C-alpha cells in the first residue's frame, strides 16, 4: 500500500482529520514538537516523518495524534510487523487472538508481529501521540 492516497483514505476512515503522508525527503533531525505544533491544537493528525523504502525492511514512520476514544480499528498486516513509540497520552492496545490489553504511556514501545490482530484506542483526556513504524507497502486486513 505505497500509494499515499490509499494510506490517507484508511487513516481518514479511522477518524484522523489532518493527514500528510507525502514525505518529500527524510530529515537528519526531526523536532517532534515542531511537527506537533504545525497542526491545529486539539485536532487529530497523522504525518509521515520517516521513509527509508529504498534501504530497509521496516521503512516507514508516521506520527499519529488522536483524541480520547479515537484510534484504529482491529486489523492485522500479513507481511509486516508494526511498532509504536509512545510520545504523549495513554493508549490501550489490544493485541493477539485473545485481545490481550496493554496500557502504553509515554516512553513505552509496543510491538505487534505480522498476522496478529491489533487495535489501538486513546484513553487519556489529553491527546495521544504515537510514532508508528512499519513497512510502507503493507496490507491491512480488518476484522
Segments predicted by a language model, with ranges:
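Ligand-binding loop in jelly-roll beta-barrel domains
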Residues: 105-106, 114-141
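Residue-level recognition of conserved beta-strand positions in structured domain cores
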Residues: 63, 76, 87, 95-97, ...
Amino acid at each position: 500500500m505505497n500509494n499515499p492516497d490509499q494510506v490517507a483514505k484508511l487513516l481518514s476512515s479511522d477518524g484522523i482529520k489532518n493527514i500528510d503522508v507525502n514525505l518529500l525527503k527524510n530529515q537528519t533531525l526531526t523536532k517532534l514538537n515542531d511537527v506537533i505544533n504545525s497542526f491545529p491544537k486539539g485536532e487529530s493528525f497523522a504525518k509521515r516523518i520517516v521513509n527509508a523504502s529504498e534501504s530497509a525492511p521496516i521503512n516507514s514512520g508516521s506520527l499519529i495524534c488522536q483524541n480520547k476514544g479515537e484510534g484504529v480499528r482491529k486489523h492485522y498486516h500479513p507481511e509486516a510487523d508494526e511498532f509504536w513509540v509512545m510520545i504523549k497520552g495513554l493508549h490501550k492496545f489490544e493485541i493477539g487472538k485473545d485481545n490481550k490489553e496493554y496500557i502504553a504511556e509515554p516512553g513505552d514501545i509496543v510491538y505487534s508481529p505480522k498476522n496478529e490482530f491489533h487495535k489501538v484506542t486513546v484513553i487519556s483526556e489529553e491527546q495521544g501521540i504515537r510514532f508508528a513504524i512499519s513497512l510502507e507497502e503493507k496490507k491491512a486486513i480488518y476484522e
